[in-house]
């Protein structure tokens, strides 16, 4: 569960290392974001010579949460930390590689590109 001020690691090769959620998109009173939800983030830590710079604002999709996601069969998929993938204004991934596993819940029409780039889909 990601909320405003939550810090997430970045699971792509855009050059950002850590981002902070500044808004959960999808409704004026929406408080939490889970896996597959779009959030507005600001870059808090970036590598030198990366595609993104510290202080820039982007859309991002949450790909891993420590809270996890409950499946229809009753199983629960949890991760060690929270991670996101940065998106452009057309909601396409900015990076060309994804690091670490992602869940099957991302296999919607919007994020098939992320699923195809990921090394492992749980």
From Swiss-Prot:
Alphabetized UniProt keyword annotations: Ribonucleoprotein, Ribosomal protein, RNA-binding, rRNA-binding
GO annotation, biological process: translation
SUPFAM superfamilies found in the cross-reference section: Ribosomal protein L14
GO (cellular component) term, any one: cytosolic large ribosomal subunit
One family name in Pfam for this protein: Ribosomal_L14
HAMAP family assigned: Ribosomal_uL14 (MF_01367)
Family: Belongs to the universal ribosomal protein uL14 family.
NCBIfam families assigned to the protein according to its UniProt record, in alphabetical order: rplN_bact
Subunit record text: Part of the 50S ribosomal subunit. Forms a cluster with proteins L3 and L19. In the 70S ribosome, L14 and L19 interact and together make contacts with the 16S rRNA in bridges B5 and B8.
Protein role: Binds to 23S rRNA. Forms part of two intersubunit bridges in the 70S ribosome.
Designated name of the protein: Large ribosomal subunit protein uL14
């Amino acid at each position: 569960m990601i909320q405003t001020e939550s810090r997430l690691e970045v699971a792509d090769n855009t050059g950002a290392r850590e981002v902070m959620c500044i808004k959960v998109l999808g409704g004026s009173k929406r408080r939490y974001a889970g896996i597959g939800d779009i959030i507005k983030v600001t870059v808090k830590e970036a590598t030198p010579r990366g595609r993104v710079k510290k202080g820039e604002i982007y859309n991002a999709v949450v790909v891993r949460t420590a809270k996890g996601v409950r499946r229809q069969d009753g199983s629960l998929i949890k991760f060690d930390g929270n991670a996101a993938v940065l998106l452009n204004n057309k909601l396409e991934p900015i990076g060309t590689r994804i690091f670490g596993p992602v869940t099957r819940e991302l296999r919607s029409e919007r994020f098939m590109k992320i699923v195809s780039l990921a090394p492992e889909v749980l």
